[in-house]
Swiss-Prot record:
Residues 166-200, 331-357 are annotated as: Disordered. Residues 176-185 have a biased composition (Polar residues). It is found in: Cytoplasm. Disulfide bonds: none annotated. This is Restriction of telomere capping protein 5. GO terms for cellular component: cytoplasm. May be involved in a process influencing telomere capping. Its main location: cytoplasm.
C-alpha cells in the first residue's frame, strides 16, 4: 500500500511538472513573441517534425539541417575537412538542456517538442530578458549548464536514451501498472546532491513559475541543478562552439548561415583557429585537461567577452520566419465557413527587409595587413560602439582605413597627418614579434579601442559615480593573440589627474596609451620626459614606430585609465578596490617588448540612422561625417602650408629670415611639436 501511494505520488508530481512545463511554454510564447512570429515558428516546426506515438519532435539532424550548422552528418556535413566546425552535437546538447527549463533536474535532456523549442528560442536570443529575473546572470548559468559535459554520464548516450524512453512511454499502457514516467531521470550532475547557492538557483526557476501558482510543486521535488558548479565544459566542446561563433559572428537577421560555414579556405580556417586558441589560452592552464569550471567560464565571458553569444540571436531567429507560410488560404477558408475573425496579415514570400547592413570594412584606402574576418569577429565579442546595440556587426558600424605603417610609412609625421585629423572613435592595431631571449619568434597582436578623437585626450565628460557606465564610451586595451586579454576602461575618469590622458602623442617620445605623462620643464632630461605606465595596463610606442611595450600590471602602478584584467567596469569602486590586492598576487603581471611589423588605425563610423540627431522642432540636424571633416582639415592644412610659404618669401627667403619666420609660426602654434600634442587647445 505504501508502495502504491509512493508510485501515485510520483506520477502525480510528474504530471504536475509536465503540465507546468506546457503552461510555462505558453507563457513564454505570449510574452516574448508577436502573433505572426509564433505562427511562423509553428509552421517551421511542425512541417519538419518527426512523429512517434503522436508526439511531434525534432532530432539533431533536423535541427542542424534547418540552422545550417555542420554536424558531421546530413547535408551540412563535410563543411570543413578537419571537422572543427561540426558544432551540431554541441548545439543539440544545449537545446536539449534548455528545453527542459526550469526542470533540468528531472526533465533534461528533453525531447525537442514544440513547447521545448519555444523556450529554447527565448533563452538563446535576446528575448531572455523578459523572462529571466536577473537577465545575463541567470542566462550565464543556463548556458554553462547546457554546455557542461565533464562530470556527467556520456552525453550522447543520455540524449539517445532520453529520446527513446520519453517517446516509448507515450504508448498505450495499463493505468494500474507502474508504467514508466513520461519524463527521464535527467543528467547525473543535475541530481540535488548539495545545496550550495540553493536560494540563488531556486530564484532562477521561481521567477519563471511565480505567475503559475506552482512554486510549492517546484520546491517540493524539482530543485534546479545544485551541482552545476561541480560540472565542467570540456575543451573540445568549447572549442567547437567558439569556432562556430567566430565564423557566424557577421550573420545578419535571416541571413544564410551556409554562407559562413561552407567553402572556407585553409588560410581562413587557420585564422579562425588562431583566435580560438587565443581565447582558450586565457583560461587557467590546468583546465585544459580537466575542463572549464563555472567560475572561470563566468569570469571570462562577463569581463572580457560580453558579446560572445550574440551570434546565437540571428541564428535561432531563423525559426521565426518561414518561406512556405501562406496565411491567405487559412483566411479564405475561414471566410467560406462563415467564421468571423480578425484579418490575418499575409506574410511576404521573401524575408522582411531589415535595415541594410553596410560592409563592416569600408572599401578604398589600404589593404589591411592585420584585420581579417576572424580577427574582426573576435573584436565584436568585446568592443562596444553603440549604447543601444553594442555589437559592431549588428549596429552597422563602418571601419574606415585611417593609417597604415605599410601604406603611409613608419613616420610620426605621417601618423599625425592621418590620425590627428580623424575626429571620431578609432581602433589601434599593432602586429609584431615579442622580443625574448629565445630564438623562436612569437607573433602577437595588440590594440586599443579609443572612443574619443586623439586630440581630445582629456575631454571625457564628467559623470556621476552613481550612473552605470556605458561600455561604448569607455576605452579598452587588449591583446588578441597569442593570449586573449582585455583591460576595460575605468569608469572613474572624473577622478583621474590631468596628466593621465587616454592617449598622448609627441614627436619626441612617441605614442602613449593609458600612461602618466611627466610634466615638462627645463630641468627634465632623457628618461624623465618619457610617459610612465599607470593603472591596470599601458601601451607605449616609440617615435620611430619600430618598437612597442605592452604592460599589464593588475593595478600595481596605482590608478589609471584601464582596469586590471578580469574586472568589469560595472563593479563599484568599493568592490574594485577590494579585488585588486587579491589579483595582484596572480601571474598576470607582465611586460612585452614588441618589434612592430605593422601598425594600423581604423576609424569608426556609426550608422547614419543611429547617429541622426533632432533639433528642438523634431527636424533632423544635418551632420558632417568624420571623413568629410578629415578632408576639410587636410584642405585647411594645405592652405596653411601655402600661407607659411608666402610668409617665408615675404621675409626675404634668406636662411636666417626663414628661421625667424619659422620661430614666429611656432610661437603662434601653427607648426611644431605642440601642434600635435593632445593637450593643445585651439
Amino acid at each position: 500500500m505504501g508502495g502504491a501511494l509512493s508510485t501515485d505520488g510520483a506520477e502525480q508530481r510528474a504530471s504536475s511538472v509536465e503540465e507546468l512545463n506546457q503552461r510555462l511554454a505558453h507563457r513564454f510564447a505570449a510574452k516574448c513573441f508577436e502573433p505572426l512570429e509564433l505562427t511562423h515558428l509553428k509552421e517551421n516546426f511542425f512541417s519538419r517534425a518527426l512523429d512517434q506515438h503522436g508526439i511531434r519532435y525534432w532530432n539533431e539532424e533536423i535541427l542542424s539541417e534547418f540552422l545550417g550548422i555542420p554536424d558531421g552528418a546530413g547535408s551540412a556535413a563535410a563543411a570543413t575537412s578537419d571537422g572543427s566546425l561540426d558544432a551540431g552535437p554541441v548545439i543539440f546538447r544545449m537545446v536539449s538542456y534548455l528545453g527542459a527549463f526550469p526542470f533540468q533536474n528531472t526533465m533534461a535532456p528533453t525531447v525537442l517538442t514544440f513547447e521545448s523549442m519555444v523556450k529554447v528560442v527565448v533563452l538563446l536570443t535576446e528575448r531572455y530578458g523578459k523572462v529571466l529575473k536577473r537577465g545575463k546572470k541567470d542566462r550565464m548559468k543556463l548556458l554553462f549548464g547546457s554546455l557542461a559535459d565533464v562530470g556527467r554520464r556520456d552525453i550522447i548516450t543520455v540524449l539517445k536514451e532520453a529520446t527513446e524512453d520519453s517517446l516509448e512511454s507515450i504508448g498505450p499502457s495499463d493505468p494500474r501498472s507502474a508504467s514508466p514516467s513520461t519524463h527521464n531521470t535527467g543528467f547525473l550532475v543535475d541530481q540535488p546532491v548539495n545545496d550550495e547557492d540553493e536560494e540563488d538557483d531556486d530564484d532562477l526557476a521561481i521567477a519563471a513559475l511565480e505567475s503559475l501558482d506552482a512554486i510549492e510543486v517546484f520546491k517540493h521535488d524539482q530543485r534546479i541543478d545544485k551541482t552545476v558548479y561541480e560540472s565542467k565544459i570540456s575543451l573540445t566542446t568549447f572549442r567547437r562552439l567558439l569556432t562556430l561563433l567566430l565564423v557566424t559572428a557577421p550573420l545578419r537577421p535571416l541571413g544564410r548561415v551556409s554562407k559562413f560555414t561552407t567553402g572556407l579556405s585553409k588560410p581562413s580556417l587557420d585564422a579562425v583557429h588562431e583566435q580560438v586558441d587565443s581565447i582558450l589560452a586565457a583560461l587557467d592552464p590546468g583546465e585544459a585537461s580537466d575542463g572549464i569550471g563555472y567560475k572561470s567560464f563566468s569570469k571570462l565571458v562577463s569581463t572580457s567577452l560580453p558579446y560572445l553569444f550574440d551570434p546565437l540571436t540571428p541564428l535561432f531567429e531563423h525559426l521565426l520566419f518561414s518561406k512556405n507560410l501562406d496565411l491567405s488560404r487559412k483566411r479564405d477558408s475561414q471566410t467560406t465557413n462563415g467564421l468571423t475573425s480578425k484579418p490575418v496579415p499575409t506574410p511576404p514570400s521573401t524575408p522582411p527587409l531589415s535595415p541594410p547592413l553596410s560592409p563592416v570594412i569600408s572599401t578604398g584606402g589600404f589593404d589591411s595587413c592585420i584585420l581579417n574576418p576572424a580577427l574582426l569577429s573576435h573584436l565584436s565579442f568585446f568592443v562596444s560602439t553603440n549604447v543601444h546595440i553594442p555589437n559592431i556587426f549588428r549596429n552597422r558600424t563602418h571601419l574606415h582605413p585611417v593609417f597604415s605603417s605599410t601604406e603611409h610609412g613608419e613616420s610620426l609625421t605621417s601618423f599625425s597627418h592621418h590620425v590627428m585629423t580623424w575626429q571620431a572613435p578609432s581602433i589601434l592595431l599593432v602586429r609584431g614579434a615579442v622580443v625574448s631571449e629565445s630564438s623562436e619568434e612569437q607573433l602577437t597582436t595588440i590594440g586599443a579601442y579609443l572612443p574619443q578623437p586623439w586630440k581630445q585626450t582629456s575631454s571625457y565628460s564628467s559623470r556621476r559615480s552613481s550612473e552605470a557606465p556605458d561600455p561604448s564610451t569607455l576605452p579598452c586595451l587588449f591583446e588578441l593573440s597569442p593570449v586573449h586579454t582585455v583591460l576595460q576602461g575605468s569608469p572613474s575618469f572624473s577622478s583621474l589627474k590631468s596628466n593621465m590622458p587616454v592617449t598622448h602623442f609627441s614627436t619626441k617620445t612617441g605614442i602613449a596609451i593609458g600612461c602618466m605623462i611627466p610634466p615638462s620643464s627645463r630641468k627634465s632630461f632623457g628618461s624623465d620626459l618619457h610617459p610612465k605606465p599607470a593603472g591596470g595596463g599601458s601601451l607605449l610606442i616609440d617615435s620611430a614606430l619600430e618598437n612597442a611595450t605592452f604592460i599589464v600590471s593588475n593595478g600595481l602602478n596605482g590608478p589609471g585609465v584601464f582596469l586590471p584584467p578580469g574586472i568589469s567596469p560595472v563593479l563599484s569602486s568599493t568592490s574594485l578596490t577590494a579585488s585588486v590586492p587579491s589579483m595582484s598576487s596572480s601571474n598576470q603581471n607582465f611586460t612585452k617588448s614588441i618589434s612592430i611589423y605593422n601598425l594600423e588605425v581604423w576609424g569608426i563610423i556609426p550608422s547614419t540612422s543611429l547617429a541622426t540627431q533632432l533639433d528642438g522642432s523634431g527636424s533632423p540636424i544635418e551632420k558632417r561625417d568624420a571623413i568629410s571633416l578629415q578632408r576639410a582639415q587636410w584642405d585647411f592644412e594645405a592652405r596653411e602650408a601655402e600661407r607659411r610659404q608666402a610668409i617665408n618669401m615675404k621675409v626675404g627667403g634668406g636662411e636666417s629670415d626663414a628661421q625667424t619666420g619659422r620661430a614666429l609660426l611656432e610661437m603662434a602654434g601653427i607648426i611644431g611639436d605642440s601642434y600635435y600634442s593632445g593637450h593643445h587647445r585651439h
